[in-house]
UniProtKB/Swiss-Prot annotation, chain A:
InterPro entries per the UniProt record, alphabetical: NADH_DH_su5_C (IPR010934), NADHpl_OxRdtase_5_subgr (IPR018393), ND/Mrp_TM (IPR001750), NU5C-like (IPR003945), Proton_antipo_N (IPR001516)
Protein function: Core subunit of the mitochondrial membrane respiratory chain NADH dehydrogenase (Complex I) that is believed to belong to the minimal assembly required for catalysis. Complex I functions in the transfer of electrons from NADH to the respiratory chain. The immediate electron acceptor for the enzyme is believed to be ubiquinone.
Family stated for the protein in its record: Belongs to the complex I subunit 5 family.
Protein's name according to its UniProt entry: NADH-ubiquinone oxidoreductase chain 5
GO biological process, one term: ATP synthesis coupled electron transport
Enzyme class: translocase
Pfam families: NADH5_C, Proton_antipo_M, Proton_antipo_N
Catalytic activity reported: a ubiquinone + NADH + 5 H(+)(in) = a ubiquinol + NAD(+) + 4 H(+)(out)
EC number: 7.1.1.2
Entry GO MF terms: NADH dehydrogenase (ubiquinone) activity
Keyword Electron transport recorded: yes
Transmembrane segments: 3-23, 31-51, 59-78, 82-101, 119-139, 168-190, 211-231, 251-271, 283-303, 311-333, 337-357, 375-395, 421-441, 467-487, 524-544, 572-594, 629-649
Species assigned in the record: Chondrus crispus (Carrageen Irish moss)
From Swiss-Prot, chain B:
Protein name: NADH-ubiquinone oxidoreductase chain 4L
GO biological process: ATP synthesis coupled electron transport
Function: Core subunit of the mitochondrial membrane respiratory chain NADH dehydrogenase (Complex I) that is believed to belong to the minimal assembly required for catalysis. Complex I functions in the transfer of electrons from NADH to the respiratory chain. The immediate electron acceptor for the enzyme is believed to be ubiquinone.
Disulfide bonds: none
NCBIfam families in the cross-refs: PRK05715.1-2, PRK05715.1-3, PRK05715.1-5
One Pfam family named in its UniProt record: Oxidored_q2
UniProt-listed HAMAP family: NDH1_NuoK (MF_01456)
GO cellular component: mitochondrial membrane; NADH dehydrogenase complex
Transmembrane stretches, start-end: 5-25, 29-49, 64-84
Subcellular location: Mitochondrion membrane
Taxonomic classification: Eukaryota, Rhodophyta, Florideophyceae, Rhodymeniophycidae, Gigartinales
Keyword Transport in annotation: yes
Keywords (A to Z) from UniProt: Electron transport, Membrane, Mitochondrion, NAD, Respiratory chain, Translocase, Transmembrane, Transmembrane helix, Transport, Ubiquinone
Record's bilayer topology term: Multi-pass membrane protein
Length: 666, 101
């Protein structure tokens, strides 16, 4: 059953990919959806068996690479962490499958689409179930590949090609860090198995590595490399630029990749490696810094984006920041809790955005929407549920995880815990709550409540989506309402032993109980801020309609609007400072000077030139005059005899002259 | 008795003069042939001197053979020269550059 969870999506992918021609659209849709749905049912069963009854299941399939101390097997590890991810992935994936049957019905390449979705799910499952780093890396790379295929699904579009390549390459930067981490782990631990690594970690706490005269803490270095991998995959600040561009793919793809699966891989890696990260305070600090900066940055950037999907993408980025800094606070279980909840409401948001886009004839710009409330009340309701869950409205899913994370950051107000660096996360996280609710409600207003800006021709075509698209929305909105409440006690309840050995927290880093003792004012703060965000968004939308568009009231404001709308010029800076110089280097130095220049000159081109040049000179020597020939002969004879004489004296001199003479003789 | 050094000097001087005569001469091919003959002469002179000096008959036999070879050679050379003169009606060495590379 456990292996079926994995291999059903693979089977579905292969059959719908290779047999799509014979099965047809309807056949592949039915088959692949069935595969994923059965897989998700099995993973629910696995969640019950492993999570609720508190066991761990390891499966050894077959050995893979065996070379000296390096031993990799196809092994699968199912513990509570894995099964939680399994449920999230397969559930969202099967809902996305059902959704895209209808969403993609007019697409001529639907079997291909289904096949890609399935292979994506399969690789993600490989990633979470692996019991060693190599197999995890297989899933990691496979997910990147599948994301390339999916973002590039409409391969005739230039923008889709560009953003798919960007996604793959930016991810590859992180993957490079991850592979360095894997090498280092093997070098230190002589093994790539999770069980071996995690049980050996405390022994290596005092291990140092001398590199270029610097003494580096080995565990810090390893976790730094792993975190670089997570930066790439989870779109943290620095390598986040691929995520908003990846919206070029079809909307169900965005829901799958950017809500539930791919971007969570980085967070999953951090949570999986909690036994290692715990021993390195430096890396925890880095996690907090990066995570909170990402959360704040993305939340602010989302405010002035005009693309419906891009707003949600930035929101994803922001929430990933929350998860990462929650890991940095050693609250891995809360991070995973937020991950699971976030999968529900973010998939809901994406899919309902897809529903909106589908209804308004593929218009994605929010400024050209409006007053869709009358036409699509159900989509409005589910989107509102998703939004409220996202901003952490009380008693919805987001409240239980997001507000809990923020509550944990407030711990920094206790000065005697020596955790003052958390205050960084506290301030930035709390501020981004305001921006989160602001852009979420801006989205709601612009799409559903404001006067319409749609063309009349497309307004006539606005319709509520069909049942197959509604059904996943309803399931997800039920999940967004209840999931947090239902699994709260299991995941983060005080004293819950659900996680078992899957997550390790050093006792001195554990601050759960202290968070319960916070003053009530501090606990109310995030909620008040998000309400403020809602009010501010409503105020701006109702009374200051020209706030976004005619913001040339003050130069400063328009400057900031422009800056934020252009995503703080990250892309421009990257292009100017990194991409363009590298391309220039590749063309003018590596290609022009080295490949076509130096190597050609010393290789074939230069050699032929050399030979023909000297042959021209030698031809000149053959004048046809007998006396010249005679002169050469006699000269050669004389110098040859001189050399013979000298060869008894000095050997090197001899050789030199021998060549000289032979040259003339020729 | 001949001085050993003196005789060697004469023969090698003769050889050198004929050598220079071959390739310093740009005009006349007859001079070239004559230098060639002189070269044979110097060599056979050297051989005869060595045979006397070493008290060995082989050197004189060699010089006799060289005389015949030189005679045959000069006759063939002159024949070639005559044929060449018939065709080109000139025997200037400078103008013999048909085999230019």
């Amino acid at each position: 059953m456990y292996l079926l969870i994995l291999f059903l999506p693979l089977l579905g992918s292969l059959i719908s990919g290779f047999g799509g021609r014979w099965l047809g659209c309807r056949g592949t849709n039915t088959f692949s959806t069935l595969c994923v749905v059965v897989s998700s049912l099995f993973s629910l069963l696995a969640f019950f068996e492993i999570g609720l009854t508190n066991t761990t299941c390891t499966i050894f399939l077959v050995s893979w690479i065996k070379s000296g101390a390096f031993y990799v097997s196809w092994g699968f590890l199912f513990d509570s962490l894995t099964v939680t991810m399994l449920v999230v992935i397969t559930l969202v994936s099967s809902l996305v499958h059902i959704y895209s049957i209808k969403y993609m019905e007019n697409d001529p390449h639907q079997p291909r689409f289904m096949s890609y979705l399935e292979i994506f799910t399969f690789f993600m499952l490989i990633l979470v179930t692996a019991d060693n780093l190599i197999q995890m890396f297989l899933g990691w790379e496979g997910v990147g590949l599948a994301s390339y295929l999916l973002i590039n699904f409409w391969y005739t579009r230039l923008a889709a090609n560009q953003s798919a390549i960007k996604a793959l390459i930016v991810n590859r930067v992180g993957d490079f860090g991850l592979s360095l981490g894997i090498f280092l782990i093997f070098w230190v631990f002589n093994s790539v198995d999770y069980s071996v690594i995690f049980s050996l970690v405390p022994l290596f706490d005092n291990q140092f590595l001398t590199f270029l005269g610097f003494k580096l803490h080995v565990l810090t270095l390893i976790s730094l490399f792993l975190f670089i991998g997570a930066i790439g995959k989870s779109a943290q600040l620095g390598l986040h630029t691929w995520l908003p561009d990846a919206m070029e793919g079809p909307t169900p793809v965005s829901a799958l990749i950017h809500a539930a699966t791919m971007v969570t891989a980085g967070v999953f890696l951090m949570i999986r490696f909690s036994p290692l990260l715990e021993f390195s305070p430096t890396i925890l600090f880095i996690l907090i810094t990066f995570g909170s900066l990402t959360a704040f940055f993305a939340a602010v950037t989302g405010v002035f984006q005009h693309d419906l999907k891009r707003v949600i993408a930035y929101s994803t980025c922001s929430q990933l920041g929350y998860m990462i800094f929650s890991c940095g606070m050693s609250c891995y279980d809360v991070s995973l809790f937020h991950l699971a909840n976030h999968a529900f409401f973010k998939a809901l948001l994406f899919l309902s955005a897809g529903s909106v886009i589908h209804a308004v004839s593929n218009e994605q710009d929010m400024r050209r929407m409006g007053s869709l409330l009358k036409f699509m009340p159900l989509t409005y309701s589910v989107m509102l549920i998703g939004t409220l869950a996202l901003i952490g409205f009380p008693f919805l899913t987001g409240f239980y995880s997001k507000d809990f994370i923020l509550e944990l950051t407030q711990i920094s107000s206790y000065s005697n815990l020596q955790m003052s660096y958390i205050s960084f996360a506290c301030w930035l996280g709390t501020m981004s709550v305001f921006f989160t609710s602001f852009y979420s409600f801006r989205l709601i207003y612009l799409t559903f409540l404001n006067n319409t800006n749609l063309a009349k021709s497309s307004l006539n075509l606005v319709h509520e989506s069909s049942l197959l698209m509604i059904f996943p929305l309803i399931i997800l909105s039920i999940g967004s309402i209840f999931a947090g409440y239902l699994i709260r006690d299991l995941f983060v309840g005080s004293g819950s032993d659900f996680w078992g050995a899957a997550i390790f927290i050093l006792p001195k880093h554990s601050t759960f109980i202290e968070a319960e003792e916070l003053p009530i004012v501090v606990k109310w703060l995030p909620f008040i801020l998000s309400l403020l965000g809602i009010f501010f968004a409503s105020f701006v939308q109702i009374f200051l309609k020209t706030f976004y568009f005619k913001s040339n009231l003050q130069n400063l404001l328009s400057f900031f609007t422009f800056l934020i709308n252009k995503k703080w010029y990250w892309d421009v800076l990257y292009n100017r400072l990194i991409v363009l110089p590298i391309l220039n280097f590749g063309y003018s130095i590596s290609f022009k000077i080295l490949d076509r220049g130096f190597i050609e000159l010393s290789g074939p081109y230069g050699f032929t030139k050399f030979v023909s040049f000297w042959s021209q000179i030698l031809i000149k020597l053959q004048t046809g005059q007998i006396t010249h020939y005679l002169f050469f002969m006699i000269f050669t004879f004389c110098s040859f005899s001189i050399i013979l004489v000298y060869s008894y004296i000095n050997l090197t001199f001899n050789l030199l002259l021998l060549f000289f003479t032979l040259f003339f003789f020729i | 008795m001949f001085q050993q050094l003196n005789c060697t000097n004469i023969s090698s001087l003769l050889f050198l003069v004929s050598l220079l005569g071959i390739f310093l001469n740009q005009k006349n091919i007859l001079v070239m042939l004559m230098s060639l003959e002189m070269m044979f002469l110097s060599i056979s002179f050297n051989l005869i001197f060595s045979s006397i000096r070493l008290d060995d008959i082989i050197g004189q036999i060699f010089s006799l053979l060289i005389l015949t070879v030189a005679a045959a050679e000069s006759s063939i050379g002159l024949a070639i020269l005559v044929i060449y003169y018939r065709i080109r009606s000139t025997i200037t060495v400078e103008l013999m550059n048909l085999m230019k590379g």
